[in-house]
Amino acid sequence: SDVCSSDLTVGQKGKEMTEMGEMVKAGAVAFSDDGIPISDGEVMRLALMYSGQFGVPIINHAEDVDLRGNGQMNEGRWSTRLGLTGIPDVSESIMVERDLQLAEYTGGKIHIPHVSTAKSVNAIRQAKEQGVNITAEVTPHHLYFDDSSLQTYDTNLKVAPPIRSEADRDMLISAIADGTVDCIATDHAPHTVEEKENPFEYAPCGMIGLESAFGATWKMLSANKISLLDV
């Protein structure tokens, strides 16, 4: 039978859960509201409780939307130099910490997508050591680029979560090497040339990931002595 992931909440509104049990019977293997974070902690608690019962992971875009605000890139030295509104790394790690604690509390199964910060890696590593049922992924573009790459205002590098600092990137590579991060996923999100030709502030988030995924990943990991078999 066909398998797929399903919306976690009705209309991806983050308020009313879908019928997880019926969806699992129909072939759903995971639940997610895609790029819309579940901000309501009680909804996430219930989702994780059911995920433990049904044996399927909850995938939550880990981002505090209030902390993100109208941010355009990673908050730091380069956002200041480029005059672009920054997105603090804690906008991700705060949500990761919440979800990890809820997964531990409920016995649920959580998957953290597109991890981008050192703070998140540290939280995931600690949770795994404590036996929390968790998996995590990184994207090729978060392994390949750092926020200095945005100095050309290339809108193709405007993604969510944003490209982070060199220190964050180095931590992501280390997390693959030691198994804290379980897999690499493209987060493939193409847009038209016309959309990406808008000024940086108005261009949509997302980049093409399929064509360059292996090449970019292998270049960075091989340079850090990670074997092809591990990749």
Task: Give the positions of each predicted feature.
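Structural preference for beta-strand elements that scaffold enzyme active sites
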Residues: 29-30, 55-59, 109-111, 133-135, ...
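His/Asp/Glu-enriched, well-ordered alpha-helical/loop segment
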Residues: 81-109, 156, 177, 183-184, ...
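Histidine/acidic-residue-rich catalytic or RNA/ligand-binding cores of hydrolases
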Residues: 43-44, 65-80, 95, 120-129, ...
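Metal-dependent enolase-superfamily TIM-barrel catalytic cores that perform enediolate-based chemistry
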Residues: 41-60, 64, 86-105
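Active-site gating/metal-coordination segments in enzymes
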Residues: 11-49, 157-163
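Acidic, glycine-rich loop-and-beta core segments that form the ion-binding/anion-interacting portion
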Residues: 114-167, 173
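Glycine- and other small-residue-rich loops at beta-strand/loop junctions that grip anionic moieties
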Residues: 12, 33-36, 60, 88-92, ...
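Short, small-residue-biased leader/transition segments that mark boundaries at the very start
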Residues: 3-5
